[in-house]
Regions:
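A compositional/biophysical signature of low hydrophobicity enriched in polar/charged and small residues
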Residues: 1-150
Length: 150
């Protein structure tokens, strides 16, 4: 990946709705080589998908929580079962296997505290293998980005 590819990726991260001509102008290429570079980045998997970022407040996701999950045993079957369960939960925006004092960190988005309690009681707490769940709630966000510095 060269500097031009990084510029193209930067432009797409800023606004994926731009057309190839706009991107080409900004990175100093013509349309055809810009298009070909974008296609190559897609084929290599560097560009995974194009998404629309939503304003969580305007769609009613008022509560963001980070749940720290500890499993009682690190057995392959329990890990696989845990992962399968988490993938079915629409409330879970992110799930990371981490090192440290707990095993997994979940980012959860729900409409209100009642929905969060339902999620914990009816879904998360019944997942086999979980020994502890600790939750922290976002009060204010100072930085929330999806862009990587290239």
């Amino acid at each position: 990946m060269d500097l031009i590819d990084k510029k193209i990726l930067g432009e797409l991260q800023r606004n994926a709705k731009q057309n190839t001509k706009e991107i080409a102008t900004k990175v100093g290429l013509t349309v055809t080589p810009t298009y070909e570079r974008i296609k190559k980045l897609e084929q290599k998997g560097v560009i995974k998908s194009y998404v629309t970022l939503l304003d969580r407040d305007l769609i009613g996701k008022q509560i963001i929580a980070f749940c720290q999950i500890t499993l009682y045993k690190h057995q392959r079957s329990l890990l696989d079962s845990f992962k399968e369960s988490i993938l079915t939960f629409d409330e879970v925006m992110e799930c990371h296997n981490v090192s440290g004092n707990f095993d997994f960190l979940l980012k959860v988005a729900v409409n209100d505290m009642n929905k969060f309690q339902e999620f914990i009681n009816d879904k998360l707490s019944v997942v086999e293998g979980i020994s502890t769940i600790q939750s922290s709630f976002v009060m204010t966000s100072f930085k929330d980005t999806t862009s990587y510095n290239l």
